């Protein structure tokens, strides 16, 4: 009876089969039509083009969905495909273990929407106000005095994957044997320049963020430390570490001042990832960038400004 799951069909053939399978299921015609379209499409993106390959291995199926250039990528659109698979398993396959696994992927896919609201992502009007091209921001950085706090701030949000307002109390360790006294720190020696972030918004999901400073960023940091030796990456006028809120407030004011228009750290993160996507960065690299920014690949798509 289940032979159809393991056979290869054209999209139209599989569409007809799925419509027939759902014929007597008490669901709306709209839902049935959606499943009959989305599931065959999704199967066509897989290395093994069968329904069984799709339903048995959600990780591979979702990776293929994320990689295909044939659809618009957003959590909302992915939800339609994942929901179709969940419905097929719930009503047709009726495998509780498989359903539980797919429901977990469905839940993860839905998180970016809630995360977007929690992050207070900019509105369309705010986007327009902060629509400074990435290259223009980089140009402004290079025009600022070497070693200045504003130049270093822009450097840490453009020359490395930009995190949230998590640099507020980032300790600088110049000896690898030193034990950090803060959750967030940079190990800066003659042979190593490593950022470690343990206190950040999504730490329960991602545990920690680790990143290696680029050569250009190392030069920016060294110039700043030569000009103002200190224990922390960014400090107040009396050389103390910022609180998260005070750092965010200072950073937004500093960015707005030097860029001569409204700018926030969130907007800068949007501009960074939009630039990467516009540069046709590979899906694999985009996933790595998302991890270093402390969020999911789907959340990264929310960050893209068209």
What residue ranges belong to the model's regions?
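N-terminal DNA-binding module of tyrosine recombinases/phage integrases
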Residues: 1-23
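Conserved tyrosine-mediated DNA breakage-rejoining catalytic core shared by Y-recombinases
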Residues: 170-215
